[in-house]
């Protein structure tokens, strides 16, 4: 068996890193349909899930920056269409998808139709701000085009009754969902214009899925709204729901209730004007951002290939794993420390601090007495030793020797004379006795 003389040897981490780069660079973006399962949404804001079909499954991650743009709440068991890129979670060697966008299955075809019609109508100028009609500051009559049994109608009527109970209201009932809904909505708008009973119209309905709201994305509705001589406020679904009707209408309200607030008179008329301008500005920004989204997406993919955010996302996913392990470890430590505290508390309760204080006081008193006794004994001993030293000193003192009859003789220079060899005839010497001195001259 022959072996390569120079085999390329990998570490596990290096191998996983190169496999990740291979997947991300070679495969690029993929579109995938599957069923959501094992969905988790940790505090980091990222989503982790599994997409599966009847024969296979794949792990997926959708980071916070992307999932905040999802317009619905994903649930286990729900079919979704995702745009993703292949990757590898290096710490575990798990092959996974990094999801960049997500929508409910079936929304993809409708979204394409939506984008195509929106671009077509925008090119014709139907969305232009110059085509918008100003809303009357004090409407004399409000027309409502919606379902006569829907919750949206009752929400609008309740708000109008609360804010301006004397404002006349005319209802033009119509279907707001289904095959014939778009035609009926267009006919209701035409009927309101031909009767010319109102000076403002609210067109809308409550929230729903993309399919539920689709009649407001039909071209016939958009063109009828654009052709209306009466200013129209669109109020379709919730704030996150955006339809073609919203772009064509003179003003978009986020909800039916908000539309009623917008068209009804209020004592604070100046605040109403400011609020209206804010809504128009937001609508213009939304249109602009929507028009630029496709243009940005091409550049976004190129940038993201080398963007540090990719590494940050991987590290963030790893951090989620470490956070989970840390939480488990902290919980175990807390339990052990709690057990120790309970044991220490029990031991502490069996010890009396007062008893220990009393014992320490007694010990201090004993040590104090012993210290004083030791000081007294030491002082007495030092005095005795001092007396003995004084006696010894007195014994060797020259004065004591002189008292016994001895004398001390010195020459003229003061040097001590201890021998006759040290004096000569004629020298002057000084002799000291115990009671004084005598000077003498040496004769011989």
Swiss-Prot record:
Molecular function (Gene Ontology), one example: exodeoxyribonuclease VII activity
Catalytic activity field: Exonucleolytic cleavage in either 5'- to 3'- or 3'- to 5'-direction to yield nucleoside 5'-phosphates
GO terms (BP aspect): DNA catabolic process
Major place of residence: cytoplasm
Classification via CDD domains: ExoVII_LU_OBF (cd04489)
Classification via Pfam families: Exonuc_VII_L (PF02601), tRNA_anti_2 (PF13742)
Keywords: Cytoplasm, Exonuclease, Hydrolase, Nuclease
Subunit structure: Heterooligomer composed of large and small subunits.
Family, similarity comment: Belongs to the XseA family.
UniProt cross-references to NCBIfam families, sorted A to Z: xseA
HAMAP family per UniProt: Exonuc_7_L
Stated role: Bidirectionally degrades single-stranded DNA into large acid-insoluble oligonucleotides, which are then degraded further into small acid-soluble oligonucleotides.
UniProt name for this protein: Exodeoxyribonuclease 7 large subunit
Protein source organism: Aliivibrio salmonicida (strain LFI1238) (Vibrio salmonicida (strain LFI1238))
């Amino acid at each position: 068996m022959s072996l390569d003389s120079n085999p390329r040897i990998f570490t596990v981490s290096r191998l996983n890193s190169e496999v990740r780069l291979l997947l991300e660079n070679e495969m690029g973006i993929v579109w995938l349909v599957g069923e959501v399962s094992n969905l988790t949404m940790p505090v980091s804001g990222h989503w982790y899930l599994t997409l599966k079909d009847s024969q296979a499954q794949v792990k997926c991650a959708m980071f916070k920056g992307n999932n905040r743009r999802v317009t619905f709440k994903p649930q286990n068991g729900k079919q979704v269409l995702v745009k993703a890129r292949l990757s590898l979670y290096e710490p575990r060697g798990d092959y996974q998808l990094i999801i960049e966008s997500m929508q409910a299955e079936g929304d993809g075809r409708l979204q394409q139709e939506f984008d195509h019609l929106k671009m077509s109508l925008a090119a014709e100028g139907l969305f232009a701000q110059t085509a918008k009609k100003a809303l009357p500051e004090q409407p004399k009559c409000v027309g409502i085009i919606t379902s006569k049994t829907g919750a949206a109608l009752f929400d609008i009527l309740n708000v109008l009754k609360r804010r301006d109970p004397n404002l006349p209201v005319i209802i033009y009932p119509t279907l707001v969902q289904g095959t014939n809904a778009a035609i009926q909505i267009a006919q209701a708008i035409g009927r309101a214009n031909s009767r010319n009973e109102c000076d403002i119209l609210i067109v809308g309905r409550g929230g729903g899925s993309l399919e539920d709201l689709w009649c407001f994305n039909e071209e016939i509705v958009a063109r009828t709204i654009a052709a209306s001589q009466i200013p129209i406020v669109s109020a379709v679904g919730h704030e996150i729901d955006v339809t073609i009707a919203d772009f064509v209408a003179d003003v978009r309200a986020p909800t039916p209730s908000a539309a009623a607030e917008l068209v009804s008179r209020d004592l604070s008329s100046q605040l109403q004007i400011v609020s209206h301008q804010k809504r128009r500005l937001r609508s213009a920004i939304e249109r602009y951002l929507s028009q630029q989204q496709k243009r940005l997406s091409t550049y976004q993919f190129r940038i993201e290939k080398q963007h540090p955010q990719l590494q940050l996302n991987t590290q963030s996913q790893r951090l989620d794993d470490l956070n989970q392990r840390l939480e488990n470890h902290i919980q175990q430590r807390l339990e052990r420390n709690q057990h120790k505290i309970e044991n220490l508390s029990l031991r502490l309760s069996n010890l009396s601090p007062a008893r220990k204080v009393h014992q320490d006081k007694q010990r201090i008193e004993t040590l104090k007495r012993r210290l004083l006794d030791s000081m007294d004994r030491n002082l007495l001993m030092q005095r005795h030793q001092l007396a003995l030293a004084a006696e010894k000193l007195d014994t060797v003192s020259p004065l004591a020797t002189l008292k016994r009859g001895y004398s001390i003789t010195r020459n003229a220079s003061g040097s001590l004379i201890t021998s006759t060899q040290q004096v000569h005839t004629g020298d002057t010497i000084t002799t000291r006795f115990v009671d004084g001195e005598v000077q003498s001259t040496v004769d011989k």
